[in-house]
Amino acid sequence: MNNNENTGNQETIQRLKTEESLWALVSGCTKEPYVVCDPETFDDEIMMFFSAQDAQEKAKQLNEAGIPVGIVKLEKRQMLLFYTSLYTMGINALLVSEGDTQTRIQLADFVRRNKPEQDPEGKLLVENPSLHLTALYYMQETRKPSVQEGNPQIKEWQDEISNYFSKGSFIAAVQKEGNGIPVVKLNDKEVYQAIFTDIMEFQKFNKENQLRPIV
């Protein structure tokens, strides 16, 4: 870890709130933020940058190491929703890089979030951050161009995913008009019903606003 890294830097936190643009790494395997577990702090963190050049350099390093990633630009108007979505993914920290300086910021230090069991209208709030996070790690590893056979970590993730799935509550989609259930076709033979870990994942699927969620 870089010697310049520090924790809870207020200047960095302020910039994360006010910069006109930021950049983040996105996994080429999941199309979601690239997440890593810090070996010293065990933070589940994403990588963010104040400049496109720094983001591109880091992406190049990882791609050369066989880890497929890209970069995404975040405009100021997108940032609050982006930060909030990290909670539903089980991500708790941001590793912010600028030149040779790295600053680890805890998500809860600048995006506070109350998560009641029910919303004001009495509807159950469905989220599965542990499942979402484990699935991200699993897919980042198993969809790499070269996967280490017999990796015990992969089996551990599979077991955790099965456990979280059996205990969780999920969102299904039905058509607003009628009760039709949308399905996802992977090929001519495999057809699946789509279910979602949380409302944000449901909204990604419901871009035309023709569906309603049920738990």
Please give the residue ranges for each predicted region.
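An interfacial alpha-helical scaffold signature
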Residues: M1-V215
